[in-house]
Every structure is written in C-alpha cells, then in structure tokens.
Amino acid sequence: MKRAKQPTWTLSVGEWANATGNVLSLCHPDWRGVREAAYSHQGPVLETHDAAEDSAGIIEAMKQASLSVLVVQGFPPGSSELLRSAQRGGLSTRVVLHSSMAQHGTDPGESEVADTVMRLAAEGVINKVGFVKKGQAEAFTALGHTAHYVPNGVPELAPFEPLALGDDGLQVGIFAEPLWRKNVTTQLGAIALLAPARAHLMTMPTNTYLSDLEVVEHGELPYAEFVRLQGSVDLNLNVSLSECHPMSPLESYLAGVPCLMSRTSDLFKSDAQLWELTTVGEADNPSAIAAAATALVAKRHEAVDRAQHWMTSFDPIAKSLWEDFVS
C-alpha cells in the first residue's frame, strides 16, 4: 500500500472548531465502506492515508478545536502511532473494526490488525474497542477482550440523475473487488441464469469460462460516480461469504434499487419478511442466488419501501449505540 508523502487532511482546524460535540473520527480515504461508515455518525471526519504521518499535528489540532475523543475507523496505516500520541496527549481513544472473525482466520493483514488492537487495548492505549458486525463483541468479551457492538449509521445520499444503461435486459451491479469473501465469480454465475442480463462490475475475475457473459467493467470510481451507477441498475448483488455491516446495500435501497444479500450480517434481520425477501441462504450456489434475485425483482417496490422504513427505525438505535461508545 502506497503511503502519502504529505498529510491529506480533509478538514481544517477551523472547520473542526465549528463541530458540535467532542468526537473526531479518522478513516482512510480509499476504504469506501469504512469511509461512509465514519461519515454516517455525523461528526467531523479526518481522512488520511497514513495516520502516523503528522500525529503530533493532528493531536494538537484536536485540542485547539476542543475535540477530546478520537475514533479510528478501520485502523489505517499508522494508527498505532497516532493512538499512542493521543494517549500521551490526554485524549480518549476508540477503535472500530469493520472485519469479521472469518477474515481474521484467513487474512494475515486483518489478523494482525485485530491482534494489534487487542494488545493496545490491554495496554490502555485504546480505551474502547467496537465491532460493526453483530455478535463479535460478545465473543471477544468472552475471550477476555472487552468490546462493544457499534453498527454503522444510515448513510445520506445526495440527489443524482440516473444513468441510462439500456433496456435490453436486466442491468445487475456487483460492485466488489474479486476477493474470496466477496464471492464475485459465484454471483456472475447467477447472472448467467438471469439472461438476458448485463453485469456491471468494478473488476472482472480472471476466470476464462465467464467470457460469454455480457459485462461492463467500470473500475474504481469516485464515490459520487459509484453511487450514481449503483443507483442506476435494476438490481444489485451483495452476496458475500463474510460480511460485517455493509453500507452498499443501504445506499442501494436509499436510491430505490433492490439489493440481494447473503445472510452474513444482521441487516434487515429484525423484519422477518424483509429478511426473507432480500437475502439468500446459499451464498455459494449460483442457482439459489438467481432464484432469490428473480423473486426480489418481482417484489422490488415492496422491498424498497420496507427497507427504507427499516432504516428509518434502525438509525436511532445506531445513534444511541454510537453515543454510548464515544461517551
């Protein structure tokens, strides 16, 4: 991962001073879901590629702006150094992890981050640790590492004009990198069963047996362009093998587009009908995904209405859990 040579702060000290409250969230500008999660909590956010690059300057700026709580979202490079600086500076510190235990067991990078965070918490460098994935905080606490459930808030979408993607078949978005847990290849297999359909992707997997599919590869898009594209398709697929509290499905439903998910997060689970309509149990079965997608598209208006109602009900819960976490 390349590190920026110069600080990449997106907020000035003056803007921080205008903030209500005493909390500053920090995130990596290129980690899209984590970034949107940070902004979902409404407070000031600092984006940086390397949290250690000017840690002393960040801490001093926070003090000048009367921001006394630092929340690191997703643990960007340099977070350990920044958190130690914050501790020395008398600030209260928090870390929110957006990974799952499944990732900790298979991804060396995520494993190292989780172990580092728990070690820093044991040393008193981090005052509270949170997980956006429901069920993990209880497990870590049982293992001797006190943790809290801190789900993401509901994002806010700016108005946009939908793109004209064509009316010659179902336009389906799979906006995830082809990593093992994102399950992109399986979902492309499902799209073959939805024909006529066109897939819209970030990056096409290298499997040559997929070459007959109609695919548009869009690459990594700026956030506003991504939201516009995601909100212009007929259906989005987010059928991953491991998930935490994904933001893309929420953005999709806010834009009026149904999104099929796996049952690896607790999104919509409190509404049994919505859960049944918007999720699929067999995440590694393209036929099951295609069948669930067909059923979802047939009831897209009901799904969108129920999802938006769910978000309206859930957001105060997320806000309350966040306030408890940062207090």
What positions do the PLM features span?
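Active-site proximal beta-strand in glycosyltransferases
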Residues: V69-V71, A86-G105
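A charged, aromatic-enriched C-terminal amphipathic alpha-helix characteristic of glycosyltransferases
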Residues: A283-S287, V297-S327
